[in-house]
Amino acid sequence: MTESKNSFNAKQTLEVGDKSYDYFALSAVKGMEKLPYSLKVLGENLLRTEDGANITADHINAIANWDPSAEPSIEIQFTPARVLMQDFTGVPCVVDLATMREAVKTLGGDPDKVNPLNPAEMVIDHSVIIEAFGSTLALAKNVEIEYERNEERYQFLRWGSKAFSNFRVVPPGTGIVHQVNIENLARVVFDNNGLAYPDTCIGTDSHTTMENGLGILGWGVGGIEAEAAMLGQPVSMLIPRVVGFKLTGEIPAGVTATDVVLTITEMLREHGVVQKFVEFYGNGVKSIPLANRATIGNMSPEFGSTCAIFPIDEETVKYMHLTGRSEEQVALVEAYAKAQGMWLEQDAPEAEYSEYLELDLSTVVPSIAGPKRPQDRILLTEAKEQFRKDLPDYCSAEPVDESLPAKRMDSEGAVQKEGEDVAGYNSSRAGHGESAAEGAAGRQSNPVVVSSPNGGEYTLDHGMVAIASITSCTNTSNPSVMIGAGLIARKAAAKGLKAKPWVKTICAPGSQVVDGYYKRADLWKDLEALGFYLSGFGCTTCIGNSGPLPEEISAAINENDLTATAVLSGNRNFEGRISPDVKMNYLVSPIMVIAYAIAGTMDFDFETQPLGQDIDGNDVFLKDIWPSTEEIEETIAGAISRELYEADYADVFKGDEQWQNLPTPEGKTFDWDEKSTYIRKAPYFDGMTMEPAPVSDIKGARVLAKLGDSVTTDHISPASSIKPGTPAAQYLDENGVARNDYNSLGSRRGNHEVMMRGTFANIRLQNQLVDIAGGYTRDFTKNGEQAFIFDACQNYKAAGIPLVVIAGKEYGTGSSRDWAAKGTNLLGVKAVITESFERIHRSNLIGMGVIPLQFPAGESHASLGLDGTETFDIEGIEELNNGVTPKTVHVTATKESGDQVEFDAVVRIDTPGEADYYRNGGILQYVLRNMINA
C-alpha cells in the first residue's frame, strides 16, 4: 500500500483493549462528519490513499463539501480493500492474468508484476448443476458429476491459487460466494499490519452488494475491472448522488424478509436509482436483523443502484459474534466505527441525502415477483389473477373447451433406468391422478396426461410448477425464512400433504451452516417428506443450473408447447434463465416455495383454495400450516449458535478429499493446452504494442441486433446449458465433446472460442431483425438471409465490416458478467446505441473497447424510424485522440433506399479514466502498458 501524503494530518491512533491501531480520522477534515455513511467510507478511502497525483487534497475536499443536490461531475479514484470472485466470472479473470504474464514478458516487462496487490478471494459456487434430486443420494451424485465435468477448470484454479500471491480459493461444496462472504470472509474493518480501515470490496458478481448489509461498501463489477483493481488500478467513479431510504415501523407477523425486499425493489426501480448509492436510515433500521439487511443489499442490482448499504450498529457486531469472528475483530469494528462517526446512533442528527424515500415496514404484505423481472411485484392475494392476465403473453389464446379430453403422452420407452431414483423418481412421486388443469375454466388450458416411469399418471397444463427451488444466497442466508420453510414442511407433512409429482423439488443452501441447523432442528425429515432433499451447496437454480427436468415431463412441455413455471427463492427471474423448458419464473420466499410445490400450479389462490386434505378429509389451507413468528424464533434459538459457524468455517480454504487430490500444474506461467475446450489463452493482447493505435470513427457499420427494453446480460451472454445445433455446440462437436458433456456456457468462460459463439445466443433473445427467438440475425453479406449471429459475424469480419447494436432502455441489466462485453467485442461490435444503460455493463463495454452511445433524450430506434437494415457512420470519436471526450457524436444511418436518418448520440464515457481505457483499446491493455512503464 502506497504511503498517504496525509495532507490533513489525519493519521491518528486508536486504542482498542490492549492493542493500538493507526487510522485516518475523518474528523481531521471539516465537513466529513455531515456526510452519509457511504460517503464517509469513500472519504476515508481517499484520505488513506492520497498520493498527490491520482488522489489529491482537492479530491478529499470535494467529497467533504459534497453537494447532495448536485449532479455527479467530480471524478475520484476509489481503491477497494479486496476483490471477491465466483468461479464463472473468476476463471476468465485467472485466464486473463495468466495471459497478461506472458504478454508482459513478450513486451519486455517483469511477469512477476502480474500479481494481486490486495486480497483476492474466489468461492467456487457456480458449477454444481442439479442433475439429481428427490433422494438422499442427490447431493453425492451432483458433487460427483460436478467434479467429472469441471476437473480441468478446478485444476487450473488450484494452479492459480499457488502461482499468484494474495489469491485464495474456497473449494466447491462450501457454499455461495456472497453467503460465505458475509458469514466468514468479510472483515468489516481491516487490520493491515496495525493500520485500521473500512473493509471495502468489489466483486465479479453483481450481488456482491449483499455485503452492504454488514456496512461494507462495495458492488459488482465486470471481471476485467476486477482484474485491474487486483493489479492496483483504482476504480474510476464520480462522487454519486445518495438516496436516503427511511425505514420506520416493524415487519408484521406473517410477512417475510422476501416480502420486504420485493417491496423495496419495486419502489426503488420505479424511483430510478441507476448510478446512485442507496443508504438506509431511520428508527426502523434497528428492528431489521442483519440477515434481512443482507437480503436487501443482495437485491441492489435488481433495483439498479450501485449499492444499498446499512451503517454499522449493534446488530452488526452481534452478527459478527454469532458467525464466529474473533472477539478482537468484533471489538475493533465497534471501536473503529464509533471513532469515525460511522456507528448508527438512534438519536444522532440525520445526514442530508440527494433524494428521499420512505417505507413503513408495518405496511408490507406477502408478495411474489414475476413472471420475468424482479421488480414486477405481485400481492400474494392477487397472484392467481395476475397469472391469468399474463398467461396469454406466453401461450396461444384459444378459449378453453373443457369438453375436450386431455391429450395423452405416449409412454413408450418411459422405463425407469437403474439408479434413476436419484433424479427424482421415487414411489411417493409416481402420480395418482393429480391434475394441473383442475379449475382451468376462464384461462387458456391444454391438459396433457403423462405416465410416470414409476407407475401412475398425472395431468400437466399451462401454469404447472415444473421447478420449486429453495436456492440462492438472497434467502438461504436468512435463518428466519429457511427455518420457516422447514416448519411449514413439518406441518404440511403432518397433515399428509405432498408436492405434486411433476414438480422438480430442490434444496440447495448457500452454506453448510444451513445443513447444520436443519439437522439440529430435525427439519430434514420434514423437508424430505415433501421431496426437498439436500441437492448441493451452490447457486444452482438461481443462475440457471436447475438441471434437466425428467424426460417425460420435458417432452410433454415441449411437444405440447405448455407454459411451465418455476418458483425460486432467488434474486433473478429473467426469461430463459431458470430452465429452457420454463417460460414464466417467479421469485418467492423459501416458505412459499414449499407452498407452491404442494399447489403444483401458479393458477392458485391460497386464500380460497385448499392445498389438499388431511388424513380426516378436512381441507387444509395455507393459513393452517403457516409457521408463527414465535415458532420460527424459538427454533432459531435452539438450533443456531456461534459453534455451528466456527465448525463449518474452521478451514474454509481446505476443501474435501476430491479437491485436495486434484493433480495441480506447477510454475509461474500456465502451460496452455491448445486442445482444451475449457481453458484457452485469451486473445486480447495478441499483436499489442506499447503505443496504442489512435481510435477511429466508425464507417459503413451494419446492425447485428435490434433489441427492445430490459435486455439483460443473460440475453447477451447466457450462462445456461448449451443447446445442440448452435454454434457453441458445433464447436464442441468438432472438438470431440459428447453432448452430455457440453456442460454450461458459464462453465466454459475460460475458452473464448465457446463464448464468442454463445454471445447473443439466449434462446429467449428477441432480435427484431428476424421473426424467430434465439441467437439469430440477418446477414447482409448474404443478401440479408437469416443466420446464426456468430456465423454472420464471421462473414462481416471477413468483409471488413464493423458492427453496431441498437436497443431500448435498461440495456445490460442483470449480472455483472464481463463476457457480455467481451463477446460483444470479439464479434466485431464497435458501438452499442441504446436509450439507457445499466451501470456495470456500460463500464464493461468501455473496458473492452466498445463505445456506449445513447439516443438523444426522448428518442429511440423506433421514433427515429430505424429498422436495422441501415448502414451506420459515426463521426466524432476521433476527438478522443486529442485528449477530449466529446459530449456527442454524429450518427448517420443510411437506408437501402438512400434516405438518411441523422442524430447526435450521447457519448457515455463518463470519466477521464474511462476515456483512457477506451483510447487504449480496453482497461487491461491500459493497465498492462502502465505496469511495464512503471
Curated annotation (Swiss-Prot):
Cofactors that this protein relies on: [4Fe-4S] cluster
GO biological process: propionate metabolic process, methylcitrate cycle; tricarboxylic acid cycle
Pathway assigned in UniProt: Carbohydrate metabolism; tricarboxylic acid cycle; isocitrate from oxaloacetate: step 2/2; Organic acid metabolism; propanoate degradation
MF terms in GO: 2-methylisocitrate dehydratase activity; 4 iron, 4 sulfur cluster binding; aconitate hydratase activity; metal ion binding; mRNA 3'-UTR binding; mRNA binding
Cofactor note as given: Binds 1 [4Fe-4S] cluster per subunit.
Segments of skewed composition (Low complexity): 427-445
Pfam family membership, one: Aconitase
Keyword Heme attached: no
Catalysed reaction equations from the record: citrate = D-threo-isocitrate; (2S,3R)-3-hydroxybutane-1,2,3-tricarboxylate = 2-methyl-cis-aconitate + H2O
E.C. number: 4.2.1.3, 4.2.1.99
Keyword terms of this UniProt record: Iron, Iron-sulfur, Lyase, Metal-binding, RNA-binding, Tricarboxylic acid cycle
Compositional bias of kind Basic and acidic residues: 404-420
Alphabetized InterPro entries for the sequence: AcnA_IRP_Swivel, Acnase/IPM_dHydase_lsu_aba_1/3, Acoase/IPM_deHydtase_lsu_aba, Aconitase/3IPM_dehydase_swvl, Aconitase/IRP2, Aconitase_4Fe-4S_BS, Aconitase_4Fe-4S_dom, AconitaseA/IPMdHydase_ssu_swvl
Annotated residues for binding of [4Fe-4S] cluster: C473, C539, C542
Residue numbers spanned by region Disordered: 398-454
Job of this protein: Involved in the catabolism of short chain fatty acids (SCFA) via the tricarboxylic acid (TCA)(acetyl degradation route) and probably via the 2-methylcitrate cycle I (propionate degradation route). Catalyzes the reversible isomerization of citrate to isocitrate via cis-aconitate. Could catalyze the hydration of 2-methyl-cis-aconitate to yield (2R,3S)-2-methylisocitrate. The apo form of AcnA functions as a RNA-binding regulatory protein.
Family label: Belongs to the aconitase/IPM isomerase family.
Subunit note: Monomer.
Name of the featured protein: Aconitate hydratase A
Originating species: Corynebacterium diphtheriae (strain ATCC 700971 / NCTC 13129 / Biotype gravis)
The encoding gene: acn
